[in-house]
Amino acid sequence: MKVLLLLCSCILVIHALPFEQRGFWDFSMDDGMAMMKDEEASGVGPIPTESIPDVGLPPMDLCPFGCQCHLRVVQCSDLGLTSIPKNLPKDTTLLDLQNNKITEIKKDDFKGLTNLYALVIVNNKISKINEKAFEPLQKMQKLYISKNNLEEIPKNLPKSLVELRIHENKIKKVPKGVFSGLKNMNCIEMGGNPLENGGIEAGAFDGLKLNYLRVSEAKLSGIPKGLPSTLNELHLDNNKIQAIEKEDLSQYASLYRLGLGHNNIRMIENGSLSFMPVLRELHLDNNKLSKVPPGLPDMKLLQVVYLHSNNITQVGVNDFCPIGFGVKRAYYNGISLFNNPVPYWEVQPATFRCVTDRLAIQFGNYRK
């Protein structure tokens, strides 16, 4: 009986599935990464073992020491690395090198990585990138290189690039031509750099069809000129912008979210907001406005307005909603006016006649 049990145990071990490492890193990527994982996991059903010729195991790329490799994802984060690891697997699609001490990206660091889809190299000490370092990466769509010591935007970025996150570096200049040929790019995050208006050269964004641009926490004194007219979201929070003039927003007809909070804005010229007919969300909190911006009643799709923490002393009955029989196509679902020196008990109820719910109005915290 003992022999029989031993034989059964051996048979179970022989036919057991190989160990599969799971869940070592749940990197939140888009549908592109999910598709790559599905492709890796897909099969065509069981194949009789007798039909498979014995040709030996194919050569395999070794995982760099200390890294973890799984489903073409190579994770080398938090290892104290001072340079890009050598001999990375050639089929790598996602390379994570964040939270290391890498200081430089050399010419051949990514040689052979022709299938790389995303490179995450956030929070290192990179100050130098060879002009030809990205040449092999002809399929790369996402480059996350924030929190480094870069003083300029890398040159010769892959033409396939869709998303660039380069915030919290030391970049002071966006030269004309640095984004040349990047026709697929739709998202740039470059806040937290010491950028001034004069540092953005005329034509720097020419040819780009961006949907999203963030230049927050910089040193901008006004809304930059010549940004892509295709923008859906523009975030310029935490700068030093003092005024919005009529022509500043004249080319952004597709904009539906505008972030201008935490600036020094005192004045918004009449008609400035009329160029954005599809705007849905407007952030003007933490500025120095003394009144509600003109033109809000004419914005048929506007739903959210942040005006808290300003110097607004009065709110008129027609400051938000259309006059008479004018109709909004979308009612407000969020208006914030708290922390202003306006006596909220003096505001007429009809002021908010085009708000979906009274709970959507954030008032109170009266500031003298």
From Swiss-Prot:
Signal peptide extent: 1-16
Which positions carry the propeptide annotation?
Answer: 17-37
Q: Where in the cell is it found?
A: Secreted, Extracellular space, Extracellular matrix
Identify the SUPFAM superfamilies for this entry.
L domain-like
Q: Which residues are glycosylated?
A: 270, 311
What keywords is this UniProt entry annotated with?
Disulfide bond, Extracellular matrix, Glycoprotein, Leucine-rich repeat, Proteoglycan, Repeat, Secreted, Signal
The entry's cellular-component GO terms read: extracellular space
Q: Which residues form a coiled coil?
A: none
User: Disulphide bridges in this chain?
Assistant: 63-69, 67-76, 321-354
Which windows of the sequence hold LRR repeats? Answer: 82-102, 103-126, 127-150, 151-171, 172-195, 196-220, 221-241, 242-265, 266-289, 290-312, 313-342, 343-368
**Protein family (similarity comment):** Belongs to the small leucine-rich proteoglycan (SLRP) family. SLRP class I subfamily.
What this protein is reported to do is described as: May be involved in collagen fiber assembly.
Q: Which PANTHER family match?
A: AGAP008170-PA, BIGLYCAN
Supply the name of the protein. Answer: Biglycan
Organism encoding this protein: Xenopus laevis
